[in-house]
From Swiss-Prot:
Keywords from the UniProt entry: ATP-binding, Kinase, Nucleotide biosynthesis, Nucleotide-binding, Transferase
GN (gene name): tmk
Entries under SUPFAM superfamilies matching the protein: P-loop containing nucleoside triphosphate hydrolases
Chain positions recorded as ATP binding sites: G9, L10, E11, G12, A13, G14, K15, S16
Gene Ontology terms, MF aspect: ATP binding; dTMP kinase activity
GO cellular component: cytosol
Protein source organism: Aliivibrio fischeri (strain ATCC 700601 / ES114) (Vibrio fischeri)
Family: Belongs to the thymidylate kinase family.
Cited InterPro entries: P-loop_NTPase, Thymidylate_kin-like_dom, Thymidylate_kin_CS, Thymidylate_kinase
The protein's name: Thymidylate kinase
Enzyme class name: transferase
GO annotation terms (biological process): dTDP biosynthetic process; dTTP biosynthetic process; dUDP biosynthetic process
Length: 210
């Protein structure tokens, strides 16, 4: 039976490495070619929206509300045109970010009203949600240090530390209240983090009959 697995976390949390570990673990269980997605993005139209969110426009500031609407527009395209069709075909989907990112970054970081965020989510997604979310938790200071070491920062990554602290608080709030979210301490050494991801995913796969 197809499943939708998402990897979440702040900048520098090691999501890319986590995704590799997830894909390798799934392959060991015979799930060799899952559909992989990223948000924002993942379709031609959604990638255009990603560029606006990540880079903005040189001649016009992107308002927080416009950013929020772009993110949900991109998500609607991806879910409707890629994720749901793949799941309907019986394929597994592994996503780099999903709605939890908006709840954390726009709801927590930007400070949008909780009711508005839930209304946006429910309007665009209804009862659709990932079967499993692996949240890579990291101290924002360490995460930003890692992100800076990778090179030039995008528009979101250039936000001040308190933005990411608020985003992390919201991430943890959801993670502590939703059994479908597994929290990994991403501030540890790479080997420990890798083992934690594999162990958690293996246990989840066994529990879910794979």
């Amino acid at each position: 039976m197809s499943k939708f697995i998402v990897i979440e976390g702040l900048e520098g949390a090691g999501k890319s490495t986590a995704i590799k570990n997830v894909l390798a673990t799934l392959a060991k269980h015979g799930i060799t070619s899952p559909v992989t997605t990223r948000e924002p993005g993942g379709t031609p139209l959604a990638e255009k929206m990603r560029e606006l969110v990540k880079q903005g426009h040189p001649d016009e500031p992107l308002t927080d509300m416009a950013e929020l609407l772009l993110l949900y527009a991109a998500r609607a395209q991806l879910v409707g045109n890629v994720i749901k069709p793949a799941l309907a075909r019986g394929e597994w989907v592994v996503g780099d970010r999903h709605d939890l990112s908006s709840q954390a970054y726009q709801g927590g970081g930007r400070g949008f009203d909780r009711e508005l965020m839930m209304t946006m989510r429910n309007t665009v997604l209804g009862d659709f949600k990932p079967d499993l979310t692996i949240y890579m938790d990291i101290d924002p200071k360490l995460g930003l240090q890692r992100a800076s070491a990778r090179g030039e920062l995008d528009r979101i990554e250039q936000m001040k530390l308190d933005f990411f602290e608020r985003s992390r608080e919201r991430y943890l709030e959801f993670a502590n209240s939703d059994e479908s979210i597994i929290t990994i301490d991403a501030g540890q050494d790479l080997e420990t983090v890798t083992n934690s991801i594999i162990t958690a995913l293996e246990a989840w796969l066994v529990k879910n009959g794979n």
